[in-house]
Amino acid sequence: MSSANQDATRGQIEAELDDPLRALGLDIEAVEITPAGKRRILRVAVDKDGGVTLDEVAEATREVNRVLDGSEVMGEQPYTLEVTSRGVDRPLTLPRHWRRNAGRLVKVAFADGRAATGRILDSNEEQVTLDVGGTRQQVAYAEVKKALVQVEFNRPTDGPGDDGDDGGDDEAGEA
């Protein structure tokens, strides 16, 4: 399949899946088609505010299967479907990505060559506010060349995005 055909197919898939997945409260973050021998792999990444659960990914998988089974968009060649969450390895490219990662640590490469690592404090449609070394910095998205969420094993629990749940049992247990 040529690159132009593949782009058209991705666009058609996204158009067919957009409304059914929005009905589940999910946004399509990426559609990828990769050749794998005589088959293709169709990967659909979904997300929503607060992140997606495994049950929501399973429900999205069933819905994508239902829609594609009733469509000709994938043609006759067999394919394997993978529905996933967005994942932390994908760059933050849209305002909703910044909003959904409030409280997380990000590494930002700026268009002018500078770089910074800071925590997302707030964001809107035009800019993000970061805490960089204790200093609040407002950054317009237009200034950002690339931004990636950093994986933290000991993430602070008193910042934005913290729900206050430490994962422990709030009820007293019996001995």
UniProtKB/Swiss-Prot annotation:
Q: Which Gene3D superfamilies match?
A: RimP-like superfamily, N-terminal
Task: Read off the InterPro entries from this record.
Answer: Ribosome_maturation_RimP, RimP_C, RimP_C_sf, RimP_N, RimP_N_sf
Compositionally biased region (Acidic residues): 160-175
One GO CC term, this protein: cytosol
Q: Where is this region: Disordered?
A: 152-175
What main location does UniProt list? cytoplasm
Matching SUPFAM superfamilies? YhbC-like, C-terminal domain (SSF74942), YhbC-like, N-terminal domain (SSF75420)
Q: What does this protein do?
A: Required for maturation of 30S ribosomal subunits.
PANTHER family associated with the record:
RIBOSOME MATURATION FACTOR RIMP
Q: What is this protein called?
A: Ribosome maturation factor RimP
Q: Which species expresses this protein natively?
A: Nocardioides sp. (strain ATCC BAA-499 / JS614)
Organismal lineage: Bacteria, Bacillati, Actinomycetota, Actinomycetes, Propionibacteriales
**Underlying gene:** rimP
